[in-house]
Amino acid sequence: MTTPWGERVLSRFPEDPRDRLRAWDASDEYLLGHLAEREVPLSGTVVVVGDRWGALVTALAPHRPVQITDSHLAREATRVNLERSGVEPGSVRLLTTQDPPPDRVDVLLVRVPKSLALLEDQLLRLAPALHEGTVVVGTGMVKEIHTSTLRLFERIVGPTRTSLAVKKARLIFAEPDPALKRPANPWPLGYRLPDDVGRLSGRPVVNHAGVFCADRLDIGTRFFLRHLPAPGRFRRVVDLGCGNGVVGTAVSLADPDAELLFTDESFQAVASARATYRANEVAGQAEFRVGDGLAGVPDGSVDLVLNNPPFHSHQATTGATAWRMFTGARRVLRPGGELWVVGNRHLGYHVRLRRLFGNSELVAGDRKFVVLKAVKE
C-alpha cells in the first residue's frame, strides 16, 4: 500500500496465497491521504478504531497510535504487518473492545464497522475522552455509510458532515460538542430466548454489541438448538465460532459433566458467551478463549465440535473461513469424534464435509437450513 509516509507491505491474517483480497481498501487510502493533505496534527493520543488488518496503524506508526479492535485476526495481522514494516512493536498500543479506552483522545479515526451496534458502543465508550479540540474522522466505503451511521456520530459526538466520494469511499467529519447530552450505553443487551428452542427455551442470553443478531436469536442458531446431539456421549466439547454461546450453554445444561470450550475470534462474542453461560448458572466446566479457530487445541483431544460458520468476511462472501473451521475440527477430533454443523442449504457444506471426512449425514433440514454431522474415522 502506498501511503504519504512511504510504502507498506501488508497482508491479511492468517496469510493464504490463494486469498486475493487486500489488507486495505480505498477508504483506508482516502483517510490517510486526507490526514497528510490537510496536515492534521497527529500529536497527543491518536486512537484508531476498527482497523481491519492494521493498514492504518501501520502507516501511522511513527505517531504511536492506539488501536482498538474487536477482531483477534485483525490484531494478529497488525502485529505481522508492523514487524514486516520494520516498526518497533511497542510504538503501537493494541487494545480490544473489552479493554478500558484511553482517558483522553486527541485524534479519533474510525473505520466504520458493519455493525451499527458496535459503532454505537465504541463511540459511547470513547465519548468521555473527547474534548473540544479532538479531531474525529470516520472512513468507509459508500455502501457501508448510511444515514443511520451519520445520525450516530451526530447523536454521540456532535455536528457531523461527510466528504465527497472518492473511489467509492467517503469520509465522515464530526466535531465534538462538550454540551451534548449523550444517551446511556445500552450494551450489553440481555433478553430471554423464545419457547421453541429446546433446552434453552425461555432462558437468558447476553449479547455485547457487534455479535451477530445481537438483539434477537438468529434463525440458523434457532434451528440448530432444536437439533443438538443427545447428551451423555461427549466429554470434551467445543463451541467453535461461539458467538453469544447459546449452543455450548445448551450442551452444558443438558450434560454438566461435559467440558466445554467456547472459542471465537471476536472479543465481544467471547464476552457474550461468558455472560450467557453465567446468566444461566450452569454447573459444568467451561473455558472461554479468543483466538484463531482451534489454534492451540491439541490434536485428537475433542469428542464433539459444534459449528455455525460465518460465510462473510466484512463485505465479501467467502467459504474460506468455514473450510478452515472444518479442517481444524478434523485435526482436534478423536477417532469417532463428531463435527455438527448448521448452515444455509445453498452453501453445500455436505460436499466439503465428504471431501474432508469421507462422510456427511443429514441430521435435520428445512427449506433454508441443514444440520449436518461428520464423523472422524
Swiss-Prot record:
Subcellular location: Cytoplasm
Superkingdom assignment: Bacteria
Keyword line: Cytoplasm, Methyltransferase, rRNA processing, S-adenosyl-L-methionine, Transferase
The keyword Membrane is assigned to this record: no
Signal peptide: none
Enzyme Commission identifier(s): 2.1.1.174
Single GO cellular component term: cytoplasm
Any one GO MF annotation of this record: rRNA (guanine-N2-)-methyltransferase activity
Catalysed conversion reaction: guanosine(1835) in 23S rRNA + S-adenosyl-L-methionine = N(2)-methylguanosine(1835) in 23S rRNA + S-adenosyl-L-homocysteine + H(+)
Transferase in keyword set: yes
Protein known as: Ribosomal RNA large subunit methyltransferase G
Known function: Specifically methylates the guanine in position 1835 (m2G1835) of 23S rRNA.
Family to which the UniProt record says this protein belongs: Belongs to the methyltransferase superfamily. RlmG family.
Gene Ontology terms: biological process: rRNA base methylation
